[in-house]
Amino acid sequence: MSFQGKKSIPRITSDRLLIKGGKIVNDDQSFHADLYVEDGLIKQIGENLIVPGGIKTIDAHGLMVLPGGVDVHTRLQMPVMGMTPADDFCQGTKAALAGGTTMILDHVFPDAGVSLLAAYEQWRERADSAACCDYSLHVDIPRWHESTKEELEALVRDKGVNSFLVFMAYKDRCQCTDGQIYEIFSLIRDLGAVAQVHAENGDIVEEEQKRLLEQGITGPEGHVLSHPEEVEAEAVYRAVTIAKQANCPLYVTKVMSKGAADMVAQAKRRGVVVFGEPITASLGTDGSHYWSKNWAKAAAFVTSPPINPDPTTADHLTSLLSSGDLQVTGSAHCTFTTAQKAVGKDNFTLIPEGVNGIEERMSVVWEKCVASGKMDENEFVAVTSTNAAKIFNFYPRKGRVAVGSDADLVIWNPRATKVFSAKSHNLNVEYNIFEGVECRGVPTVVISQGRVVLEDGNLLVTPGAGRFIPRKTFPDFVYKRIKARNRLAEIHGVPRGLYDGPVHEVMLPAKPGSGTQARASCSGKISVPPVRNLHQSGFSLSGSQADDHIARRTAQKIMAPPGGRSNITSLS
């Protein structure tokens, strides 16, 4: 079955390329070899390759040849109060390619009154006509009702979607109850998809927002103050608990704090199938900027969960990422102009949430993890590309440099440096949250679908060239353990005889509107309390009695010790 759908954009002819002298880096090995690309695929890898004449040759001596980056979390079309992000599918994917990312996974978020299927079609239509690189889609579940089950089944069966996100925050808008989350996770497990969660305690966040506004705190600092680290960590723990009970794989998006990251790491060490996604912002900057005197700058950092103000957070997250306790990196790229952010100038709860990071992600991870000595080049490939491809089931088409894989490649210079700035970034916003940050490790050539799209600092992109990448269910990387546990977790009752002894009667609470209580035994059966019928009773106040035929003793002798005793305890 084809998931491609309608696509009116003509296919762009790929280049025939020979990449010579580079060091090919995958998640599990590195080696020097030449590489030949044709028809958008990697055709040959080795030495002394026999290739056609007249092809373009790229000299990669002293450089690395990596699989193109995969950004697992973008929101390039997220609707907020009637506004859409400044960086749409065209601008956002252009920035992605500039940073070495050749595929994104964007989140579909339905507007009120729009079904999941209709929202999916809206996203496909927008992305197909604008995306400059390949893309796929997660689908968010902002509301849960009976028809949602059929929609999820259709998205999995017919639309190539295998991941769905639920919210534990945004009360009265899209926050799910624990019971709903358990039901959704159970369904997702049966469908063979990946359950994602935005983890924050929405009830506490709402109360904190009210309290701060009552105290007159209206600026961006109120955002981070109303989202303390503990509400993220608590929600992660709760999500892990629910997922474990449902035996459903869990993917925690936007891991922003030490507490949340530790919860993911501890659960993983206990054997829970859970994945954690720190983003560019949580790895590359901190939340001290919420207190900037410049309101517009402070507002540019507003996202949920917030960037943690603790300056040691990034170091902690990169350590867990390097050790494998966290497995993937996204950007959660969702940018708004200063004018759009200013909708919340008098109330921080109205500031549109979202930060940049799609262009900076690869270099930030290299600087913070590889250049610092925390991880090697292979682990870098794993957390920026391969693990995402495995989790969401498009590996080895993406995420690997191998014969037959898509020719999405990055020629990486580990020694080159780049300073990020709003003056030079490929975004449509006035602020860059990584302003002035210098990173080692930059892409010098980027190849998408076998075409050179970045070379010598020049971007050569084509809007609409990006393809939708469908994904099948039950990815082995995720579900092998889940399937084994399903087989082992069959529950059988204890064989025993029926209990036929007495059952105590209890009062059941009255049903609303009934005004009466019912009496029930512990077995759950409702019984009417016995009432003596005095008209049929043998009791009489005078005359003969019904039990006159029973012999009675005329007297009872009380036995007591000499001198008597204060308490009579026995009669005979």
Swiss-Prot record:
GO MF entry, a single one: phosphoprotein binding
Phosphoserine: modified positions: S537, S544
Location, primary (coarse class): cytoplasm
Alphabetized InterPro entries for the sequence: Amidohydro-rel, Hydantoinase/dihydroPyrase, Metal-dep_hydrolase_composite, Metal_Hydrolase, Metallo-dep_Hydrolases_sf
Annotated GO CC locations: cytoplasm
Domain of life of the source: Eukaryota
Keyword field: Cytoplasm, Phosphoprotein
Gene3D superfamilies in alphabetical order: Metal-dependent hydrolases (3.20.20.140), Urease, subunit C, domain 1 (2.30.40.10)
SUPFAM superfamilies: Composite domain of metallo-dependent hydrolases, Metallo-dependent hydrolases
Subcellular location as annotated: Cytoplasm
Stated role: Necessary for signaling by class 3 semaphorins and subsequent remodeling of the cytoskeleton. Plays a role in axon guidance, neuronal growth cone collapse and cell migration.
Binding partners and assembly: Homotetramer, and heterotetramer with CRMP1, DPYSL2, DPYSL3 or DPYSL5. Interacts with PLEXA1. Interacts with FLNA.
Family assignment from sequence similarity: Belongs to the metallo-dependent hydrolases superfamily. Hydantoinase/dihydropyrimidinase family.
Alphabetical list of PANTHER family matching this protein: DIHYDROPYRIMIDINASE-RELATED PROTEIN 4 (PTHR11647:SF55), HYDRANTOINASE/DIHYDROPYRIMIDINASE FAMILY MEMBER (PTHR11647)
Protein name, as recorded: Dihydropyrimidinase-related protein 4
Gene designation: Dpysl4
